[in-house]
Amino acid sequence: MPRKHFGTDGIRGQANSVITPELAMKVAQATGVLFQRGEHRHRAVIGKDTRLSSYMIEYAMVAGFASVGVDALLLGPMPTPAVAMLTHSMRADVGVMISASHNSYEDNGIKLFGPDGFKLSDEVETKIETMLDAGFALKLSKPADLGRAMRVEGDRARYIEFAKRTLTRSLSLEGLRIVVDCANGAAYKVAPEALWELGAEVISIGVEPDGFNINRGVGSTSPQALVKKVREMRADIGIALDGDADRVLIVDETGKIVDGDQLMAVIAASWKEDGRLSRPGIVATVMSNLGLERYLESIGLTLARTAVGDRYVLEHMRSEGYNLGGEQSGHIILSDFCTTGDGLVAALQLLAVVKRLEKPVSQVCRRFEPSPQVLRSVRVAAGKPLEDASVARAIDLARKRLAASGRLVIRASGTEPVIRVMGEGDDLDLVESIVNELCDIVASSARAA
């Protein structure tokens, strides 16, 4: 049964239209009630990114938590992984990140974490949805039991120290010129500070948030500004985070972009050499490049694939005992340290390899030649074209045409009203032809719905 509010990464939509103060308050009430276990004073940690609507949602959630007797601990602008870490570290009952990640300022969202710092399971989110429809009149606290709200002091320093401790104490980034792009988002203070404290020469862009410019022409989804700055400053490396800093892309010293697949390859090879992999393989999604899979096989590692979404990567990692996984988009999960994707920590693991090998980033990060990959999106206003018999036949035929030389992935987005069609293989012309044909068929089916 399709869910009304929760997608693949919490609740997300246009601020004050989909993500309203009323919805935010009700989500806080439902979550607060659900996680009230034991007789202790209940607490919720709340972080946010820098978009204008985050204030509105934050205050609405404070009201919701307070109304059911839960204290709200306010972090202000902080990366998603910092919220996850601090939720667990501060023994809170629940954590909240107010963010729409890489989306523009018009959107916002709510990500929820349990007391262990992990994102909530589908089952728990479904319980919250059920509670949203049931109402809370009988669950509201008495006046003497209402929750309080308070700002947390020193949270930024705690996260920076946490990130630094993922490296050996003897490692210094001295001698490296690093350009870091914080997307005018949640990491605009912590990322530059952490890199500077580790000894790097830091040049920062995307560190002037105004409520409207998050992800606008900067960050991991718009790396052109970082590419330009790396070349201009003759930097050793560029690090691009997204709006809530749970994903990262790298730019090498030549200005070439290094995606999450290449980054996972570097870390996997390094951890294998050091004996740090908990299993002889890593976890990625169906969207990761075939070249990554072939590279891992060449060094004796396997690639387990999941549905798209870092939560599904993490669920498979936890159930099967992996400690490294991620997505091509730059969500890298290092479960020895983190309970969710952490762009800064992933970048630090790469920098550790660069320092150890004493080679340029371009040499360190080019582990494999990516298979030609074509990704298209078809906007769907209504209907379910993937359930159309003609679309199913076309997909089956396309897979037979690719045979063993490639892959085809067709899926509905969990965050937008689009169907994504991805094809990859050794023959780029064939892949492009197949993807374009499928997009036309899906679009035609959607129009006929």
From Swiss-Prot:
Cofactor remark from the record: Binds 1 Mg(2+) ion per subunit.
Alphabetized GO MF terms: magnesium ion binding; phosphoglucosamine mutase activity; phosphomannomutase activity
Active-site residue list: 101
EC number: 5.4.2.10
Cofactor: Mg(2+)
Gene Ontology cellular component list: cytosol
Binding site for Mg(2+): 101, 242, 244, 246
Recorded catalytic activity of this chain's protein: alpha-D-glucosamine 1-phosphate = D-glucosamine 6-phosphate
Residues where Phosphoserine is found: 101
A Pfam short name: PGM_PMM_IV
Presence of the UniProt keyword Aminoacyl-tRNA synthetase in the record: no
Keywords: Isomerase, Magnesium, Metal-binding, Phosphoprotein
EC main group: isomerase
Alphabetized CDD domains for the sequence: GlmM
Lineage top rank: taxon: Bacteria
GO biological process: carbohydrate metabolic process; peptidoglycan biosynthetic process; UDP-N-acetylglucosamine biosynthetic process
Post-translational modification: Activated by phosphorylation.
Main function: Catalyzes the conversion of glucosamine-6-phosphate to glucosamine-1-phosphate.
Family, similarity comment: Belongs to the phosphohexose mutase family.
Protein name, entry field: Phosphoglucosamine mutase
